[in-house]
Amino acid sequence: MKQKFIFVTGGVVSSIGKGLTAASLGALLEGRGHKVTIMKFDPYLNVDPGTMSPLQHGEVYVTEDGAETDLDLGHYERFTSALMNRSNSVSTGQIYDTVLNRERRGDYLGGTVQVIPHITEEIKARIYEAAQGSEIILVEIGGTVGDIESQPFLEAIRQMRIDVGQENSVLVHVTYVPYIAAAGELKSKPTQHSVKELREIGLQPDFLVCRSEKVIDDNLKAKIGLFCSVKPENVIAAQDSRFIYEVPLALHREKLDELIVARLGLSAGKLNMKGWQNLVKILGNPSHTVKIGVVGKYVDLKESYKSLHEALVHGGVANNARVEIIYVDSEKVTDKTVHSLLGKVDGILVPGGFGTRGVEGKITAIKYAREKRVPFFGICFGMQLSAIEFARNVCGIKDATSREFHAENKRTGNFVIDSMAEQRGVINKGGTMRLGAFPCAIASGSRAYQVYKASSIMERHRHRFEFNNKYKDLFEKNGMMASGICKERDLVEIVELPDHPWFVGVQFHPEFKSKPLAPHPLFVHFVKASLKKK
């Protein structure tokens, strides 16, 4: 059987939900027994999002093989069993970088290098590469139809649909149908114009997924279908859901998966979505509520912590609880304000981050959690700061710090957190950190061992700095245990306080491996401990 290609585009506005649509459709096709993968094209000129501000781009999602990617890849992995890698996330910057390097080497034999065919051929080559080993590949095109940046990708899709045959490809266009309160009705004109933009470049959508606040009835579907040359049954209503994990079930109710399977000549299989149904049931009617305070510096944009947010939700579901996440700006946390900001939460989490802004506020929050015996979870930078707090306030090293905070001077001192040897002298920032999955050996009898129920694990990393081993004996003497070690490099990956209700810091990012139907055990146990504190 030939591979099948499902292209997902978006119109009218950005952030319309293309990624969730692709991920949800992937979940439905998997539920019917098909092997899927999903890839994302981002139209920006950055090579990857690794050096972009989270406040502009949202979180950087790290894959097993160490690629720094768009947060939509997190949706793809959470909604399906597919494992993403660097071939699943491609930017305009990567495409141009590859083509221009070939030109410099003389690979084009003196020919004029142009968007068509050179850029479009490279785009198609990336799709074929990502599709290897899968039966179906869903390809999300970032941006909005009509944007200049997206045009080469749309042209490549037009060519591919001819190359692979219309019977082996489907174009799903996600659009927006706004509700005009003054008129009391939904308006289809923006969708019509968005499809018109697609048709002008030779693309006719097979399916329209219409986002809306209100119910789209059959009459409006028929109207949209008529003006957009789409069968009315292929106009899919996608009303706003309470939870993102309702989206696969909502699309199934509209028969999107059935229609696409039939359109591509695939086996319908027997759909099994019981896990998703149970998940939504718990989310809609939990037995408990728990408050978790997340102390960070990127709180103005919640998507900066997207995977973290979802992992906490997963941990709540495993405990039949709704997790109320309270985001706290670390710059506002001081000795005077910490109790008013965190006094009513049941657990405190300090996530990853970079730089000095807001550091002392995070350290104050960690001290509060340790002294008040509030369940605490430190991730990456949060783990490093928990070590600094412990060094200052328990071990008596008042000038304990991280070399990251003094990178531009030659200060010597108590660098409890120090740069790894291979990071010293690194000039380029992009793609040069310790990235991807690495092994960690867990000490028997530790809380980490109780959580994982395993002596060896693999977790994903994104950092330049590590715990300084010359302080390890002093820390353990004063009560902080190094319970997880990367033995290949003798790097401390997990620290914990055995005499605290729940105080764990990890150098890696467990949120990247949490799924709604398979919550990460660290988040399950953190939420469980927070419920006990409540």
UniProtKB/Swiss-Prot annotation:
Residues 1-266 are annotated as: Amidoligase domain. Allosterically activated by GTP, when glutamine is the substrate; GTP has no effect on the reaction when ammonia is the substrate. The allosteric effector GTP functions by stabilizing the protein conformation that binds the tetrahedral intermediate(s) formed during glutamine hydrolysis. Inhibited by the product CTP, via allosteric rather than competitive inhibition. CTP binds at S14, D147, I148, E149, K187, S188, K189, P190, T191, Q192, K223. Mg(2+) binds at D72, E140. L-glutamine binds at G353, F381, G382, M383, Q384, E404, R464. Its EC number is 6.3.4.2. Pathway: Pyrimidine metabolism; CTP biosynthesis via de novo pathway; CTP from UDP: step 2/2. UTP binds at S14, K187, S188, K189, P190, T191, Q192, K223. GO terms for cellular component: cytosol. It is an enzyme of class 6 (ligase). One of its GO terms (molecular function) is identical protein binding. Catalyzes the ATP-dependent amination of UTP to CTP with either L-glutamine or ammonia as the source of nitrogen. Regulates intracellular CTP levels through interactions with the four ribonucleotide triphosphates. This is CTP synthase. The gene is pyrG.
